[in-house]
Curated annotation (Swiss-Prot):
Organism: Chlamydia pneumoniae (Chlamydophila pneumoniae)
Binding residue positions for NAD(+): G177, G178, G179, V180, I181, E200, A261, I262, G263, R264
Cystine crosslinks: C42-C47
GO molecular function, one term: dihydrolipoyl dehydrogenase (NADH) activity
Family note: Belongs to the class-I pyridine nucleotide-disulfide oxidoreductase family.
Lineage start: Bacteria, Pseudomonadati, Chlamydiota, Chlamydiia, Chlamydiales
Residues that coordinate or bind FAD: E34, E35, D36, Q37, A38, G39, G40, T41, C42, K51, G114, D304, A312
Gene from which this protein is expressed: lpdA
Protein name per its UniProtKB record: Dihydrolipoyl dehydrogenase
The protein's enzyme class: oxidoreductase
Cofactor note: Binds 1 FAD per subunit.
GO biological process: 2-oxoglutarate metabolic process
Length: 461
């Protein structure tokens, strides 16, 4: 007997499970199809396991700098298998919690791969092989790491998934690709004592981000001892039993492992799009409107496959928007205030427009930077390097963008995200009492400096 649902979601990653929960809470009969583990790449093979390892690396960093706090450590060892075990325990615990959430919302979970048979039918192949009917379908099949052209992933040529499965630390690691993923792993493994070489084809790393951010990270990495090769051309990658040889700029270099971090490819080739008449472009991206609807009125697409921002928090919000529209509430996706974070050391976070982007839109904008060395809490933490920057409208004082390089940037960016989303002005920030001593004071101080009324920094002459 064919099961019928109001809403069927294919893929249980950050976009899919959030869409399913939102739909179920709107009283829609909801099914969620997943071939692997709930949580998708983010929980199982990306965001969470990498941040669990980074947490361990941060402990190492604190130990290395313990003497400045009057604490003398007589030596330490890095038990990487134990770090990896903790990472797996963290992931398992969160996944179990997620599975409980899905059950508590009375969502029907079907194990297997889902593909479209028509615009209202989905075939499931796997543990729960069946064909189900749905009034609405949400595609949330995500993406996967892109291999280097002509070089498949292997035991030594690793994707971002493969490197998280290592149980021993390499001595020498090459990272092909100086984007966010490449830089995060470079920072992580360098802190753990691995010799790192970042190989980037463009003339600078983090090429898609703010130029000042790129230069700052380059300077920090170089100072830390991370080797960066830009304008690099790779002509060969050869794997042997114990090493990988890379020919870069006509020079042969040897490494224990290679991480390929050159982007991701979209999982849309085998989900039956043609059977339902759903359009995708040459990259595999499924075009959607502001409600996440595809060209087929009852089929929606969310997450990486929309080709917007390949970020878990964007995917989740797209899931909410799609489910809300299916349940009869007209809501649209707003990309004006999307925070992005780079979990290097130091952390980096940004949201909204850069000064260059604001000027390209012919906005009368100004950039104000406030240093952490003038923030008491940062000095007390021994983390006074870096700054927070605000891009504001010179006439209206509306906050247009912000970025921060320094301690706990990933948490600090939330205030500016709220400000930009709600079109707040500089006075909205500095007239709000910020607790002292906290790092968040950097925004109040920065907003005051932008109006040339700084309290803890010399005024501009």
């Amino acid at each position: 007997m064919t099961q019928e649902f109001d809403c069927v979601v294919i893929g249980a990653g950050p976009s899919g499970y959030v869409a399913a929960i939102t739909a179920a809470q709107s009283k829609l009969r909801t099914a969620l199809i997943e071939e692997d583990q709930a949580g998708g790449t983010c929980l199982n093979r990306g965001c969470i396991p990498s941040k669990a390892l980074i947490a361990g690396a941060n402990v190492v960093s604190h130990i290395k700098h313990a003497e400045q706090f009057g604490i003398h450590v007589d030596g330490y060892t890095i038990d990487y298998p134990a770090m990896a075990k903790r990472k797996n325990t963290v992931v398992q615990g969160i996944r179990q919690g997620l599975e409980g959430l899905i059950r508590s919302n009375k969502i029907t979970v079907l194990k297997g791969t889902g593909s479209l048979v028509s615009s209202t039918e989905v075939k499931v192949i796997g543990q729960d092989t069946t064909i189900i009917k749905a009034n609405h379908i949400i595609l949330a099949t995500g993406s996967e790491p892109r291999p280097f052209p002509g070089v498949p992933f292997s035991s030594r040529i690793l994707s971002s998934t493969g490197i998280l499965e290592l149980e021993v630390l390499p001595k020498k690691l090459a990272i092909i690709g100086g984007g966010v993923i490449g830089c995060e792993f470079a920072s992580l493994f360098h802190t753990l004592g691995v010799e790192i070489t970042v190989i980037e084809a463009l003339d600078h790393i983090l090429a898609v981000n703010n130029k000042e951010v790129s230069q700052t990270v380059t300077n920090k990495f170089t100072k830390q001892g991370i080797r960066i090769l830009t304008k690099a051309s790779i002509s060969a990658i050869e794997e042997s039993q114990n090493q990988v040889r890379i020919t870069v700029n006509d020079q042969v270099e040897e490494f224990d492992y290679v991480l390929v971090a050159i982007g991701r490819q979209f999982n849309t080739a085998s989900i039956g799009l043609d059977n339902a008449g759903v359009i995708r472009d040459d990259r595999g991206v499924i075009p959607v409107d502001e409600t996440m609807r595809t060209n087929v009125p009852n089929i929606y697409a969310i997450g990486d496959i929309t080709g917007k921002w390949l970020l878990a928090h964007v995917a989740s919000h797209q899931g909410v928007i799609a489910a809300k529209n299916i349940s009869g509430h007209h809501e649209v996706m707003d990309y004006s205030a999307i925070p992005s974070v780079i979990f290097t050391h130091p952390e980096i976070a940004m949201v909204g427009l850069s000064l260059q982007e604001a000027e390209q839109q012919n906005l009368p904008a100004k950039l104000t930077k406030f240093p952490f060395k003038a923030i008491g809490k940062a000095v007390a933490l021994g983390a006074s390097d870096g700054f927070a920057a605000i891009v504001s409208h010179e006439i209206t004082q509306q906050i247009l963008g912000a970025y921060v390089i320094g301690p706990h940037a990933s948490s600090l960016i939330g205030e500016m995200t709220l400000a930009i989303r709600n079109e707040l002005t500089l006075p909205c920030i500095y007239e709000t009492v910020h607790a002292h001593p906290t790092l968040s004071e950097v925004w109040a101080e920065g907003a005051l400096l932008a109006t040339n009324h700084p309290l803890h920094f010399p005024p501009k002459s």
